[in-house]
């Protein structure tokens, strides 16, 4: 006879040995219980009966989400062992967690393995196989994600649409994709969010380490980014929310990447990029641009013709240092007519590459020539 799906509710078992309490007390007691799940279906079905959820060595069936949406306030989710996802072409996400005052963490040796190589074909989201996004941290408010080790996501790793979310000491390791066809493996994609703090992240990938498409009061500190497209804002424009405001990138490194620091806006769109700081960013092995700010993106690619519908103002670039490849451009600024204002640059020391002669409408306080 097949065994029942395991669900161990420790506090509930302890309570069974006692006299039955009043119904309201049973409900409160159950919600304080610790539950260990070893399969995705039971975890998704029984998630609200537990305030401490342990996910141990789960293999998620093909085409399904490990769904921890709408958790009880104050729930803690802990991953143990290896969590894996079986292969199927679909959009995902592979993992979804939402709720208020939630803590998401793992044991010291745990791995969330997206098995990305099964989907990787060098196309990313531009064609080929349909690839699922990995983790939706949507409506995960007043919460914390701490210490996760995420490996080999099919495409984008963590999509953030939340308020008051802290992400600390998370590793996203898609380095296998360098040789196995990983593409569009963004580390953190942030949209329609406020008060997001990311500290101590390590991202090895083939796209943006961080991409902020919309949101306010976002802080990224102590990050280590390699292999991808750098620390990015945008593309801004053409979405429901086209405002990026009060963003700080500080005390971080970007290595072996296409870009170091990047802001990009959509041609002929409208929006606002305001109060942006990049401070103490160390660069090495940058292949395309050390600093690139351009207002000419159309259908996902730069055109060389800027527009001024998205304003970029109150930008501080300070203490950005390091080296780029010999055929890379150290600084490239392409603004629309009058759309970039109130910029300051100081302590910029980027070496090894070329000085651009194609910059346009560079605002006072900034320069393409150090």
From Swiss-Prot:
Q: What EC number(s) are associated with this protein in UniProt?
A: 3.2.1.15
Keyword Lipid biosynthesis recorded: no
GO terms assigned for molecular function: galacturan 1,4-alpha-galacturonidase activity; polygalacturonase activity
Where, per UniProt, does this protein localize?
Answer: Secreted
Biological process (GO) annotations held by this record are: cell wall organization; pectin catabolic process
Xref: InterPro entries: Glyco_hydro_28, Glycosyl_hydrlase_28, PbH1, Pectin_lyas_fold, Pectin_lyase_fold/virulence
Q: Which chemical reaction does it catalyze? A: (1,4-alpha-D-galacturonosyl)n+m + H2O = (1,4-alpha-D-galacturonosyl)n + (1,4-alpha-D-galacturonosyl)m
Q: Name one Pfam family in it.
A: Glyco_hydro_28
Record keywords, A-Z: Cell wall biogenesis/degradation, Disulfide bond, Glycoprotein, Glycosidase, Hydrolase, Repeat, Secreted, Signal, Zymogen
Q: Where is the signal peptide?
A: 1-19
Q: Thylakoid: present as a keyword of the record?
A: no
The chain's disulfide connectivity reads 35-50, 209-225, 335-340, 359-368
Name of the top EC class for this enzyme: hydrolase
Query: Predominant location of this chain?
Result: secreted
Q: Which residues form the propeptide?
A: 20-32
**Family stated for the protein in its record:** Belongs to the glycosyl hydrolase 28 family.
Q: What is this protein identified as?
A: Probable endopolygalacturonase A
